[in-house]
Amino acid sequence: MAPPAARLALLSAAALTLAARPAPSPGLGPECFTANGADYRGTQNWTALQGGKPCLFWNETFQHPYNTLKYPNGEGGLGEHNYCRNPDGDVSPWCYVAEHEDGVYWKYCEIPACQMPGNLGCYKDHGNPPPLTGTSKTSNKLTIQTCISFCRSQRFKFAGMESGYACFCGNNPDYWKYGEAASTECNSVCFGDHTQPCGGDGRIILFDTLVGACGGNYSAMSSVVYSPDFPDTYATGRVCYWTIRVPGASHIHFSFPLFDIRDSADMVELLDGYTHRVLARFHGRSRPPLSFNVSLDFVILYFFSDRINQAQGFAVLYQAVKEELPQERPAVNQTVAEVITEQANLSVSAARSSKVLYVITTSPSHPPQTVPGSNSWAPPMGAGSHRVEGWTVYGLATLLILTVTAIVAKILLHVTFKSHRVPASGDLRDCHQPGTSGEIWSIFYKPSTSISIFKKKLKGQSQQDDRNPLVSD
């Protein structure tokens, strides 16, 4: 059954970002996604990291079946190197060695990094009790997936294969209790597929039963989703859905380390988990890019196969990313500085006065409620009142009054030395001579900088303006 035509859609540029990325460095993740390591492209060139033998170069093994002369285009990963490879689809990577043992001129490679996700490892089995104690069966057509499917149908978490024909199921969290064995000790071929490893004599290879399931729900930050029936070829007429939902993720990074779909009618789709809109579609004639990002935290993975042309399938590796949002900074007040102007008249030597003009401005880098250089909070001023509330403002006012008093005292001393008589109040109205006695002083105070004093001449003077600058009408 073909997928609904309604899901035929264009790629969403807003939700899907294609981006080529470099391959992961060795040791940062799994280097194999197949059960037999046919996809291994690592750089191990010894049969074992400890006590192993060096591998021969593939371009120097012309006397053997596999070499660069016979496979010059890099088939099977061969080349001018001596890295372990699996060009013939054996149960694990191998290489030619110089020292023959009983006429054997090659050896399997023990590669810790070449273990497909879902493969829990190779373990010892002493038999009483076995590592998995749920149920078991034997079959002369056993494969990895037939054993996994059998255990999954019985609601078990783990499936184990031993000696190529025995299948064990269980939920035992201590399946490792008898000890772990080298992966090469579980290389007995499955009776149903000679390219798959199915344990060994007294050795059991374990798998998670989620491997190869048709559908599932994923919420972990990262995981691998395999095509149905993996590592066997996917069956005909498959329609499978997997949900990948990681709340809080800013985007999910996807890559296809394995993609073997040969029919254009068989397809893999990524859908928006909320709207079910198709974000991307891949099939035999449209392969996925190396990697890409989906800017969602909820994605549905869909797979459809028709009734012909089966293949190996796919492995999808996803990694959710949660980005911490930067803390919001308080808004900077960019408005015009609020100017509070108050006038004060001070009597100087019998009605000789000087007026003080206060201009308090806000610093562009501070909100108007905050006095620069102080942690105190000052409440906002009323629209119809010149009175400023708050202890901080009173402190500033006191400082200004003291400053003005000092200036006035200095003026008085200057006037006293230059004049020996104090004019009467009536004479002040007719006094127009220039000098400091008839000049008005203005002080502009900016909290963020300093106090500047300059002279400002006023045309009209009134003795009725002798008021405290902080007292309103």
Swiss-Prot record:
Residues 214-321 form the CUB domain. The keyword Chaperone does not apply. One of its GO terms (cellular component) is plasma membrane. GO terms for biological process: apoptotic process; cell communication; limb development; negative regulation of axon regeneration; negative regulation of canonical Wnt signaling pathway; negative regulation of ossification; regulation of canonical Wnt signaling pathway; signal transduction. The keyword Transmembrane helix applies. InterPro entries: CUB_dom, Kremen, Kremen_rcpt, Kringle, Kringle-like, Kringle_CS, Kringle_sf, Sperma_CUB_dom_sf. Keywords: Cell membrane, Disease variant, Disulfide bond, Ectodermal dysplasia, Glycoprotein, Kringle, Membrane, Signal, Transmembrane, Transmembrane helix, Wnt signaling pathway. Disulfide bonds join C32-C114, C55-C95, C84-C109, C122-C186, C147-C167, C151-C169, C190-C198, C214-C240. It is a single-pass type I membrane protein. Residues 414-473 are annotated as: Essential for apoptotic activity. Residues 1-19 form the signal peptide. Glycans are attached at N45, N59, N217, N293, N333, N345. The chain crosses the membrane at residues 393-413. One of its GO terms (molecular function) is transmembrane signaling receptor activity. It holds the Pfam family CUB. Residues 31-114 form the Kringle domain. PANTHER family: KREMEN PROTEIN, KREMEN PROTEIN 1. Receptor for Dickkopf proteins. Cooperates with DKK1/2 to inhibit Wnt/beta-catenin signaling by promoting the endocytosis of Wnt receptors LRP5 and LRP6. In the absence of DKK1, potentiates Wnt-beta-catenin signaling by maintaining LRP5 or LRP6 at the cell membrane. Can trigger apoptosis in a Wnt-independent manner and this apoptotic activity is inhibited upon binding of the ligand DKK1. Plays a role in limb development; attenuates Wnt signaling in the developing limb to allow normal limb patterning and can also negatively regulate bone formation. Forms a ternary complex with DKK1 and LRP6. Interacts with LRP6 in a DKK1-dependent manner. Interacts with DKK1 and RSPO1 (via FU repeats). This is Kremen protein 1. It comes from Homo sapiens.
